[in-house]
């Protein structure tokens, strides 16, 4: 049984990888431990958030699936940081996690070129450092040249609840020990990480009347640029707070906390600590927020976001019932911590193919990341690049200046990680260029070129791009003089008058200027759609900042164009420290730009390396 591409793992990374490969024409097999759990939301029932929403928009622009399914299964939509600048706003949706899972599974089962089998992958088969297949627990050998591993927390997974330990990849599902051993046998550098999840509580046991209600946006915007209609009927979330009694209960159980007893060895996520870790680290806090999120549209269970814990079950019940509104709470599913193996992402090329084994790709939590969106983004890129390689086409490597996906992968590959990595807007140097609202303008060309984005979606983007270019040309080339007619116009739209001739862009850049006012500024804008007008207005308001970032990008592109010859011996370059030589050898950056992103590689070292490359190229001509 031979396939062009085999994907191991049916989580968010595996879904995007298998769909991408199959849609690009590769005969694809998805191997998953439990077919019913394809697309399961193991942790919180939500997609997106700050920076994570950017990733979902970029996945969508490339032709991926996550945004479309979120729109189909969303039960609340919110734009976070709406009062701040467009670069740091983030879309977030609560999802019906049951419907999301069924939707994704049905989609995969009905996708041409894609087969699904419920088996456990146990061994990676190689020959002369090339992938030739994968073996399963049923002694089936599946042949392939491209193998994508997207195992999430299942690699040697170990669940902790108090002193109790359970080998599992998720509660109720087996872990994958043999596959972890197989990866280690390939001499890949591996480590151990930890994450956790929160209790789920029976809705009828919660007193919602004493909780703060949090509604979605009145006029929600879908995640996908391709979604034309979606269910705007939304469910509320709620906010609760821990208190000093809660904290006392947690402190009294520190001696039973796997996190503090040494039972857990893996490093947990810095920005999503367990509740016991919060109480330990922030002992002066009087309370901590808890976000009470419905798991489905029926809202029979609620996820207690912010209450991740691995304390014993009895302690979980006691501390939860100390929270106002939860005095009679009944836990349906307890919280737990889980440790799992991961591969150091410095073992990867920017294509997400391993450097040591040709045809072996890794995506998702196996690369040290945390989050559905980070996983899906990697899965999509691994699937695309595996399929492109089969066609002997150039790989798709997104730059840091054109996508958050590019930032994510570049950070992982060039810097590595010793703790679960999550995306933040602060990780992107050019975030004004990488807004949610222009993701399709930035990336649709790639999605269309590889064959994932439909033609109509690409043409819609081209129309938006044309409107933006024409609109900005008008704003930058046409002026407004302080004559009587113009002053009366400004007064009619409640705008301050001008005392000198100014470009229309300066008028549009005012904080008070809206798309309704823009429509009246020039006849070109009169009949434009809101999406185009919003895009034009954003570009106008941040024009000078955007222009400055584009200048910085052009400087960096100069470094991108300078490739580091594989034959260049770093240790022979005078002036490079032993640390720099060691890191250059370890990471093998393909370009000067990639080298400059490696932690510890100084600007001086880049200058020395640049000179050495010039000399090397002249000598080898």
Swiss-Prot record:
What GO cellular-component annotations does this UniProt entry give?
A: cytosol
- Predominantly, its location class is cytoplasm
The transmembrane residues are none
Q: Which SUPFAM superfamilies does the record associate with it?
A: FAD/NAD(P)-binding domain
Question: Where found in the cell?
Answer: Cytoplasm
The cysteines joined by S-S bonds are none
Question: What GO terms in the biological process aspect are recorded for it?
Answer: tRNA methylation; tRNA wobble uridine modification
Residues binding FAD: 9-14
Report whether Transcription regulation shows up as a keyword of the record. no
Q: Where does NAD(+) bind?
A: 268-282
Known cofactor(s): FAD
Q: Which UniProt keywords apply?
A: Cytoplasm, FAD, Flavoprotein, NAD, tRNA processing
Which InterPro entries does the annotation name? FAD/NAD-bd_sf, GIDA_C_N, MnmG, MnmG-rel, MnmG-rel_CS, MnmG_C, MnmG_C_subdom, MnmG_C_subdom_sf
Q: Return the NCBIfam families for the record.
A: mnmG_gidA
Family per UniProt? Belongs to the MnmG family.
Please identify the protein, giving its name as recorded: tRNA uridine 5-carboxymethylaminomethyl modification enzyme MnmG
What species is given as this protein's source?
Campylobacter fetus subsp. fetus (strain 82-40)
- Underlying gene: mnmG
């Amino acid at each position: 049984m031979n396939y062009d591409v085999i994907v191991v793992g049916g989580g968010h990374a595996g879904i995007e990888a298998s769909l991408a490969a199959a849609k690009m024409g590769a005969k694809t097999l998805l191997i998953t431990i439990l077919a019913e759990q394809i697309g399961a939301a193991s942790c919180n029932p939500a997609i997106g958030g700050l920076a994570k929403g950017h990733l979902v928009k970029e996945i969508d622009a490339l032709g991926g699936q996550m945004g479309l399914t979120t729109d189909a299964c969303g039960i609340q939509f919110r734009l976070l940081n709406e009062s701040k600048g467009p670069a740091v706003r983030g879309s977030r949706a609560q999802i019906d996690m049951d419907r999301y899972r069924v939707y994704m599974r049905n989609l995969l089962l009905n996708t041409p070129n894609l087969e699904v089998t419920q088996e456990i992958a146990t061994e990676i088969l190689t020959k002369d450092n090339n992938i030739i297949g994968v073996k399963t627990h049923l002694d089936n050998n599946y042949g392939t040249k491209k193998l994508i591993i997207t195992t999430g927390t299942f690699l040697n997974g170990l669940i902790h609840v108090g002193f109790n330990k359970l080998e599992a990849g998720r509660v109720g599902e087996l872990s994958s020990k043999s596959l972890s051993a197989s990866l280690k046998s390939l001499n890949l550098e591996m480590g151990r990480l930890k994450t956790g999840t929160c209790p789920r509580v029976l809705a009828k046991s919660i007193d919602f009347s004493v909780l703060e209600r949090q509604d979605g946006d009145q006029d929600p915007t879908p995640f996908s640029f391709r979604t034309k209609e979606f269910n705007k009927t939304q469910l509320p979330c709620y906010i609760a707070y821990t208190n000093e009694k809660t904290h006392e209960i947690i402190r009294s159980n520190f001696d039973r906390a796997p996190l503090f007893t040494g039972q857990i060895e893996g490093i947990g996520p810095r920005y999503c600590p367990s509740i016991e870790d919060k109480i330990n680290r922030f002992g002066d806090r009087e309370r901590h927020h808890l976000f009470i999120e419905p798991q489905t549209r029926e809202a029979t269970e609620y996820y207690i976001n912010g209450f991740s814990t691995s304390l014993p079950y009895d302690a979980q019940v006691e501390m939860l019932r100390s929270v106002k509104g939860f005095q009679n709470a009944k836990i349906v599913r307890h919280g737990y911590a889980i440790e799992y193996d991961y591969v150091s992402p410095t073992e990867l090329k920017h294509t997400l193919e391993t450097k040591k084994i040709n045809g072996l790709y890794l995506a998702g939590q196996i690369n040290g990341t945390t989050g559905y969106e980070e996983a899906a983004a990697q899965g999509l890129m691994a699937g695309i690049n595996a399929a492109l390689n089969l066609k002997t086409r150039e790989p798709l490597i997104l730059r840091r200046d054109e996508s958050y996906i590019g930032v994510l992968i570049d950070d992982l590959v060039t810097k590595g990680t010793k703790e679960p990595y999550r995306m933040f807007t602060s990780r992107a140097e050019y975030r004004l260029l990488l807004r949610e609202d222009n993701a399709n303008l930035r990336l649709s060309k790639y999605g269309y070129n590889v064959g994932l984005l439909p033609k109509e979606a690409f043409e819609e983007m081209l129309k938006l791009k044309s409107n933006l270019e024409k609109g900005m040309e008008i704003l930058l080339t046409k002026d407004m003089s302080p004559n009587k007619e113009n002053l009366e116009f400004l007064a009619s739209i409640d705008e301050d008058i001008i005392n000198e001739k100014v470009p229309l862009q300066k008028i549009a850049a005012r904080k008070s200027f809206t798309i309704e006012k823009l429509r009246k500024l020039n006849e070109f804008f009169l009949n434009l759609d809101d999406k185009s007008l919003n895009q034009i207005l954003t570009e106008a308001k941040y024009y000078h900042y955007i222009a400055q970032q584009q200048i910085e990008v052009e400087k960096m592109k100069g470094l991108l164009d300078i490739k580091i010859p594989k034959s260049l011996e770093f240790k022979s370059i005078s002036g490079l420290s032993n640390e720099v030589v060691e890191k250059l050898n370890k990471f093998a950056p393909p370009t000067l730009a990639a080298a400059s992103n490696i932690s510890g590689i100084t600007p001086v070292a880049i200058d020395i390396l640049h000179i050495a490359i010039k000399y090397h190229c002249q000598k080898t001509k």
